[in-house]
Each structure stands twice: as structure tokens, then as C-alpha cells.
Amino acid sequence: MILTSLNLYQYRLPLDVLLPVGKQRIDHRAGLVLQACASTNVGGEYRQVEVEIAPLSGIDVDEQVLVGFSRETLAQVQTALTELLLLLGGQHIDTLLDYAEQSSYPSLAFGLSLLHAKLMGKLDAIRPQTATVPLIYHPTDAGNDLLDNKVAALGMHVHSVKVKVAQTSIEDELSLIYGILRTRPDLKLRLDANRGFTQEQAIEFAACLPLDTIEYIEEPCQNPQDNLEFYQAIGMPYALDESLNDPNYQFAMQNGLTALVIKPMLLGSIEKLANLIETAQSYGVRCIISSSLESSLGISDLTHLAAILTPDEIPGLDTLSAFSQDLVVSSGKKHCLTLAQLEPIAQHAIDSTQQSDLGAAKREEN
């Protein structure tokens, strides 16, 4: 199939509540939507798809730069994509994979490879998981009653929840966790520390928890080299998340390592993700697809991708409740923005004569 048109849009979605990004908070999410049309030839098979490309970078509510997540900025990706559109028009869709492998921006590499997968129809017949792992954290403006009500409202089909820790005081967070377990003692907890504890703090915190209720704790220590000593001291399994963002990261099995929390927007192409997952699973390490706070468009694609790459795991994608509206794909919110309501950034299309020439050239090759 040949790429016949590409359109790039920018979005900015306000959030109804602040979302945690490590220890920081954001009140909106910004990103890009890339739409592509491809056809076999004039009058032949035709497909039109959209993908979200949204590095997790920018400014928090305190006007501080977000740290520890995407290395590239939205402006850098936008510039690269604007230039790339001129090169992609009229090319075979496999060219998307070539540019994905060449890109030094993980969010762009992932977006291009996802665009290729959707144009190829690889996500079409997939039935994604309906189960969720709800995210629980302590919003700055929420009281204990609100959190208790949220936990009490969870359906009995929910068996695990993700809890943000290393955000406030150890005492407050222990109170939060025991409050969750008091309301739903059957729940298993996935704790996410975002490297917020020193080794000593992590050990002190974990020692106060009932180990049999904890599936794992993500990135317990500020220095990931301390994770092994943390595990040896406490026996609580841990998962890696931010560690995967290191461009030099190579999987290495360690005692206590039980899971990789994989954020595709931060890591790169689908091929890179698949290779990492295959390696980790060969050592018995679980792989959990997780969001980078994408909009409904990105979350929809991640649910389908998780069903392909990690069919036996429930992905960690429960972040849409904070969004004020949906984007392109509805998740059930009252408002869903269409492409016509977004800011157009760039576009490129080949005309019918060029399409005919490309079709004729393809027939000659065959």
C-alpha cells in the first residue's frame, strides 16, 4: 500500500483533576495526532487511520520541567514529523518502519510503527481486555472519604489496584494502603514509587506492609542499583519502569525482579517492545503495558496492542477518568473532539496523477 496523504494535528486537553507524573502534577495533556491514508492503487483498497504521538514531557503545574520520562519535547517531535511528511508521501507504508527504526525519538518511533500496524489492519480483529487495574492516588484536594468511596465502588471483578506511593509522608501513605485493604481486603496492590524513596525509606515503608497483599512495587529506590538490597531485606518483589527509559537499558535478570512496566510511548517501536517482552518473559518476568497518560485515542490503541503483545496480563491503562473530554475515539465521555476541532500543523498529499503513476510502476514491477 502507498501513502497517499498525511495530516498532522495538535491537541491540548485540560484535566478535571491533577494527574501525578512521578512526584509532579499536570493539569493538561498535549500531543499530536497523525492521520494517514493509504491505497493499493487508484480505485483499489483504501485505508485511513489515526495515531496519537505524545511524549510525556513539558511543564507541571508549578512551572517546572517534567523529569524522568520522555527525553524528547513535543516541539522536537512536531518539527521532525513536519519534515517527515514531505518524505513519506507516495512511499510504501513499509517506509514507516524504516523511519521508526532511524528515529532517535521513542514517541515518534512508536507512533510510526503503530501507524504501520493500523494501516496493515493488525489491530482490527483484536478483542482487547475488558478487565482493568484501577489507579488510586491521593489527589491534593481529596479527603479520605472520597478515596474510601472510590475503593468501595470498585466492582468485585476488580482484583488488583495500582497505588501511587512516595508522594507524601510515609504515615499518610500507610494509612491510604490500610484504608484500601480495610474496605477491600481481597485486593492485591501494585505499588508505584517512581524512584521516590531512598533505600532506607523504601525498606522502612515496605516493612510496615502485609507482604501477601503486594503484587510488586515499581522502582522502589532512587538508585535502581539498591533494588536488590531492598528485596533481600524485605522480600517484596519489585518491577522496573523508569529504568527502561534509559537509552542504554538492556534486560538483565535480577533476584526479586518480577515485572517490567512498559510504556510504549517512552520506549520506541513495536518491534523493540516485542523483543524486550520476549526476552523478559523467557526469564519468567511479567510484562505490563502501561499508559503514558495518553488520550482516549492512544489508550484505545494500547488496549489492542496489549492484547497482542501481553494477552495474559491486564494492562495498566486506567488514566482516562481525569480527562475532561475524549479525542477522536470515544471512551464514553460527554464530549469527543474530532480532527476538525484540532489545530492543523502540516499536511501532504499526492494527486491522482501521481497515484496512477505509482500504480503503473507497481504493475510493471510485478
Language-model segments: what does each one mean?
Residues 1-189, 196, 207, 328-366:
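N-terminal capping/lid subdomain adjacent to the active-site entrance of alpha/beta enzymes
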Residues 12, 136-139, 242, 291, ...:
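Residues at the C-termini of beta-strands that transition into short coil/loop
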Residues 31, 257, 312:
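Active-site lining segments that contact anionic ligands and/or coordinate catalytic metals
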Residues 53, 219, 317:
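Active-site donor-binding loop signature of nucleotide-sugar glycosyltransferases
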Residues 105, 122-124, 223-225, 290-352:
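Active-site pocket-lining/capping segments in soluble small-molecule metabolic enzymes
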Residues 168-292, 296-300, 304-306, 323-332:
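Catalytic core of soluble alpha/beta enzymes
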